[in-house]
Amino acid sequence: MAMKLAVNDVKNLSGPEKAAIVLLALGEDHTRIWEALDDEEIKEVSQAMAGLGTVSASVVEDLLVEFVSGMSSTGAIMGSYEQTQRLLASFMPQDKVDALMEEIRGPAGRTMWDKLGNVNEAVLANYLKNEYPQTVAVVLSKVKSDHAARVLACLPEDFALECVTRMLRMEPVQREILDKIEMTLRTEFMSNLARTSKRDSHEMMAEIFNNFDRQTEARFIAALEERNREAAERIRALMFVFEDLSKLDPGGIQTLLRGTPKEQLALALKGASDKLRDLFFSNMSERAAKIMREDMDSMGPVRLKDVDAAQVGMVQVAKDLAAKGEIMLAGSGADDELIY
């Protein structure tokens, strides 16, 4: 086997190699990124990853800062057939690009309903509310039932009921009408989807930063501040970190305590501020607080990496509870503070 050379210059890296380094740097917890790739992309990135060899720390840092800075400064983007073709050609063989683009360009509506199934329900509802109820009925009859239900829930009630009525009376739709609806969706909705999406790049980067350990987070925030201070400040304001749990009300703290494994809680509180630690203890029974303190004392010295992982885990539990409506989170910005 040939000896793998060390990677010391970002300029010499291909697209798949850059993706491989970013994924390695983010670690094994970011499986959702892999799930978004198709089989061919996974194969290319995996091959690049296996052949990387040693990557210097400076290259990793430069590449991640380049990635973060690019995502933060780009803002809204507009995709097109030509832009996609140019992007793919920068890292894929031309014959693969041609085959893939031919598939994308194929018969109108070939994958349109599947694509709509992956569009956020609020975004899709925001578009459909301006269409005729009959058109909406056709669209919702073609997507999966669970997604159709979420879209209907986002529509104005009277309009949604009218759409439901049309769906109940619907007869088989002529192919010509379906083709026209699909073409309209492709040209008026899908092509502008990036501009209608409510989630911006700063929110995405804040989520990524939330999953860094504190040393990595501090390093990249500092590096980003040197390149783009405004972007760094926006990301910091959008981040929800462990210390922000101090803004939970007593009911929220108690709900979080019930949803957090005891071992994880002890490890997370081991590295918490006195204020936050006391807040959690005050929402436990006297006996439970005493046992928790004893468990923490018996741990002895613990690794910062393990504390960070436990705290990130608790933040994720809090976010999951908030998504279910069981607690309310306030971010790090002043506008999110609660008045009682």
Curated annotation (Swiss-Prot):
Organism: Caulobacter vibrioides (strain ATCC 19089 / CIP 103742 / CB 15)
GO annotation, biological process: bacterial-type flagellum-dependent cell motility; chemotaxis
Pfam family, any one: FliG_N
Protein name: Flagellar motor switch protein FliG
SS bond list: none
Principal subcellular localisation of the protein: membrane
GO CC annotation, single: bacterial-type flagellum basal body
InterPro entries per record: Flg_Motor_Flig, Flg_Motor_Flig_C, FliG_a-hlx, FliG_M, FliG_N
